[in-house]
Amino acid sequence: MKKVLAFDLDDTLAITKSPISDHMAETLSKVLEDFDICVISGGRFEQFKLQIIDRLHIDARKLSRLHLMPTCGTQYYRYDDVENDWHQLYAENLTDDEKNRVTEALEKVARELGYWPENPVGEIIEDRGTQVTFSALGQQATPEDKYAWDPDNTKKLAIRDGVAELVPDLEVRAGGTTSIDVTRIGIDKAYGMQKLIDTLDISKEDILFFGDKLEEGGNDYPVKAFGVDCLDVSKWEDTVTRLETILAVIK
């Protein structure tokens, strides 16, 4: 039996940038009785807290079975049930020079392609320490507007390719619904899975990963290419259904 269930966040556990539903919160609480849970996604730790932690009304024992990997696995947080607080295990921070070059490249390419927002809702380019993220409509745009902006991913891929040419020493990925994420090369969701394996002293066969962008080029694809068993989902309801099936089988 698998030991860890790992998940992307947006469109896997929740609507993009939204808190998990009551149904998902209840289901994850049940899952934590039998499995460790890892969540790996592009947002900051504060976003994880808003979308997941604050919605899970669980005890310290279950919290200690959560493994949170913000900014695509460039950071790793665990809950200390003695100190009753979250602790960062590592962070692969970008240098100031790397951040400046990425910021300039993102704005240059987005403007040249006509994708720089004139009326953004929230930050357009966000320094997340270990990652720089471009949000085409602004971080706080509504889910409806985000889903409508680039349904076939052509805009994001065009920005990604243009930025990658300007910063070849860094990793440029199409991230969430409207975002481009830039980190150090080789620091991706597969890197996060390896860190999880090392920390828990398990093998990749012990992990089952749920993601909505498992196709080649998607930001979940590195996990699949790494050799972890994966389940493809397209919305959080798919994930809940599969989790309920797993729980029914093992009980």
Which residue stretches match the model-derived regions?
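Mg2+-dependent phosphoryl-transfer enzymes with acidic/Ser/Thr/Gly-rich catalytic loops
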Residues: 1-2, 20-21, 183-185, 189-251
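Asp-based phosphoryl-transfer active-site loop
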Residues: 2-18, 39, 68, 193, ...
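Short loop/turn segments at strand-loop or loop-helix junctions that form parts
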Residues: 5-10, 70-73, 80-81, 128-129, ...
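Phosphate/oxyanion-binding active-site loops and adjacent basic polyanion-contact surfaces
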Residues: 16, 44-48, 98, 185-189, ...
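Active-site phosphate-binding/coordination module
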Residues: 19-121
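Conserved acidic, metal-coordinating active-site core of Asp-based
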Residues: 112-113, 117-208, 219
